[in-house]
């Protein structure tokens, strides 16, 4: 099997893996409400935190990150070129955002994108994670933190390993576009802040 064919197989596999909605499955297994019909309506870790608590949200976060990290790391180890690596990462995110197994109604793709970027290096992963955490703690807006971190990601990548600046910029653009409704709500002061289920 040539590297080109293998890359295409990984792209398809990345989309299918991304299409497995961790939030919906975790909530179903744990007897929680469907995140697509509760809270913000977004099947992601932040909404699961609101309706199901920290442990469920952490499990969703881990699974969503793994969906991006696994195909990206595999492609990285096989020597796939940076642009194709970016396409693979985007395929995983598109699977999360438009999941074929869940009526093409998915999440924002933030955790999956982070997972896809992580194989580039620990330094980048730490910079992204630190930026998101600081912004959430300061503003209490998960969406604002995600948007700002996505915008910072290509800058961090250029600084740490410029070979991957373009694919990371591709991912960041997708994340920002996916948050267009959040941006509108932020500008109107109508965006929900991060909260957790009270026990």
Swiss-Prot record:
It is found in: Cell inner membrane. The keyword Nucleus does not apply. It is a multi-pass membrane protein. It is an enzyme of class 2 (transferase). It comes from the Bacteria. Keywords: Cell inner membrane, Cell membrane, Lipid biosynthesis, Lipid metabolism, Membrane, Phospholipid biosynthesis, Phospholipid metabolism, Transferase, Transmembrane, Transmembrane helix. Its main location: membrane. Pathway: Lipid metabolism; phospholipid metabolism. One of its GO terms (biological process) is phospholipid biosynthetic process. It catalyses: an acyl phosphate + sn-glycerol 3-phosphate = a 1-acyl-sn-glycero-3-phosphate + phosphate. GO terms for cellular component: plasma membrane. The chain crosses the membrane at residues 5-25, 56-76, 83-103, 118-138, 141-161. Its EC number is 2.3.1.275. GO terms for molecular function: acyl-phosphate glycerol-3-phosphate acyltransferase activity. Catalyzes the transfer of an acyl group from acyl-phosphate (acyl-PO(4)) to glycerol-3-phosphate (G3P) to form lysophosphatidic acid (LPA). This enzyme utilizes acyl-phosphate as fatty acyl donor, but not acyl-CoA or acyl-ACP. Probably interacts with PlsX. Belongs to the PlsY family. NCBIfam families: glycerol-3-phosphate 1-O-acyltransferase PlsY. This is Glycerol-3-phosphate acyltransferase. The gene is plsY.
């Amino acid at each position: 099997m040539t590297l080109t064919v293998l890359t295409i197989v990984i792209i398809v596999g990345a989309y299918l893996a991304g299409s497995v909605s961790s939030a919906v499955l975790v909530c179903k297994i744990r007897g929680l409400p469907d995140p697509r019909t509760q809270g913000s309506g977004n099947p992601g870790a932040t909404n699961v935190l609101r309706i199901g608590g920290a442990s469920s949200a952490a499990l969703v976060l881990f699974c969503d990150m793994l969906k991006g990290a696994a195909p990206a790391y595999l492609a990285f180890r096989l020597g796939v070129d940076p642009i194709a690596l970016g396409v693979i990462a985007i395929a995983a995110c598109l699977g999360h955002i438009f999941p074929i197994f869940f009526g093409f109604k998915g999440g924002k793709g933030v955790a999956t994108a982070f997972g896809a970027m992580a194989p580039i290096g620990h330094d980048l992963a730490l910079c992204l994670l630190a930026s998101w955490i600081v912004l959430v703690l300061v503003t209490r807006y998960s969406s604002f933190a995600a948007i700002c971190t996505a915008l910072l990601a290509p800058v961090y990548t250029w600084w740490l390993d410029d070979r991957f600046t373009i694919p990371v910029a591709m991912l960041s653009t997708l994340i920002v576009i996916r948050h267009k409704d959040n941006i509108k709500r932020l500008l109107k002061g109508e965006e929900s802040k991060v909260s957790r289920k009270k026990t």
